[in-house]
Amino acid sequence: MKNLDNVKRIADDIKTITIQWATNIAREACKIMEQELRNWKFESHDELSRFFNEASQMLIDARETEPLLRNAMKYAKSKLKKWENANQIADAFREYLWWIEREEDIRPKIWAEIIHNWDDVFTHCHSKSVVDILLKARNDWKKIHVYNTETRPLYQWRKTSLDLLNAWVPDTMVVDSSAWFFVDNTLWNTVDIKEIFLWSDCIKPDWTVINKIWSFSIWLSAWNSWVPLYVVWSLLKVDTTDKVWIETRSGKELRPEAPDWLDIVNFAFDRIPHKCITGIITEFGVIRPENLMREVKKHYPWMLE
């Protein structure tokens, strides 16, 4: 078996969050797989397959809930079944990287058109993709004001706010617990929210969206007050497995001195029903949730194999 030290180093960096964010994780995993496949000489297809399977599984196990990473390995494996040349498998990883870069470039240019001049926009947690759309709208000379949550316990809003303020986009932080009330224009209309943009940590085949905790309450308020809610997502990040896993955080985060016999429920994520999502903003346009798998089959059929 070929040496897997370089792959293990990247896997360890992913596991310890030295490498973080979905796109960065997938990008580094693809790069190391391409590098190692080109560097090693394989004597047979069986040897190539063993190396690929062990290396790819090591990377997947480092962040098993990350579909963009898992789909990268799935795409390359679909080519492994057809080709025997390691360089061709490496080319598959390079192609996947190109898809990621294309998606990041195309989406903000097209779907910033959803935002209109003078709109008050709301977002939750931090997402570079969401920020890119907001900055593109600003670069198109649209005067917008962004409201975003604090996003406890890691306070990702600080990154969102810094990116926006550095680009001279007016920004206001809203505490998590009042976000649902803030966005409901029927209960409190001092600020008239026009659109809500949410990132997603996972979209399932049944169109369910899994995202940072408080997303469900924000969705419920948007539904109640007819505020359009968009999920910013790439088809490459659709999780085609049936497994639904909602991450929880330690109860010690809330009460470090809590007695051992006290159970504390501390969800890190929740679920957004698909029925009132206005659209999913993808690299192929804004699509309705119920059309999600049809678009996956059309553009990335290997994901459903």
Residue ranges and their predicted role:
Residues 1-89:
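Long amphipathic alpha-helical segments
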Residues 7-16, 54, 90-94, 141-146, ...:
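Glycine/charged-rich beta-loop-alpha catalytic/anionic-binding loops adjacent to active sites
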Residues 23, 120-121, 125-131, 153:
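Gly/Ser/Thr-rich loops at beta-strand to alpha-helix junctions
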Residues 54-81, 92-96, 100, 109, ...:
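Non-catalytic, soluble scaffold/interaction modules
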Residues 74-117, 135, 144-192, 196:
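Ligand-binding beta-strand-loop-alpha-helix segment within the catalytic cores
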